[in-house]
A protein has these predicted regions:
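Local sequence-structure signature of Cys/Sec-based thiol-disulfide redox active-site neighborhoods
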Residues: 1-26
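Non-catalytic, surface beta->alpha helical segment in thiol-disulfide oxidoreductase systems
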Residues: 57-78
Length: 78
């Protein structure tokens, strides 16, 4: 099960969602603002006003930290 996390530096929720996934040995790749994508590309992908982090599981958009943790709980992954 692979997750893709869109992050920015200095984001505590980005750190938290990565810690949750790492704590359960769930694999993920990280894409960082300005290193892998621009803010404009981020808004095109997730919608204007979207916040960090944004998490995908395959092509499914899970949302931010809270939504991702909810998804993991509902699917008995944490």
């Amino acid at each position: 099960m692979n997750f893709e996390i869109y992050t920015r530096s200095g984001c505590p929720y980005c750190t938290k969602v990565k810690q949750v996934l790492q704590g359960k040995n769930l694999s993920f790749s990280e894409k960082q603002l300005n290193a892998h994508f621009t803010r404009e590309e981020f808004y095109q992908k997730f919608g204007a006003g979207s916040t960090f982090p944004q998490v995908l599981k395959g092509s499914v958009k899970l949302g931010g930290c809270t939504e991702t943790v909810r998804y993991l709980r509902e699917n008995n992954l944490i």
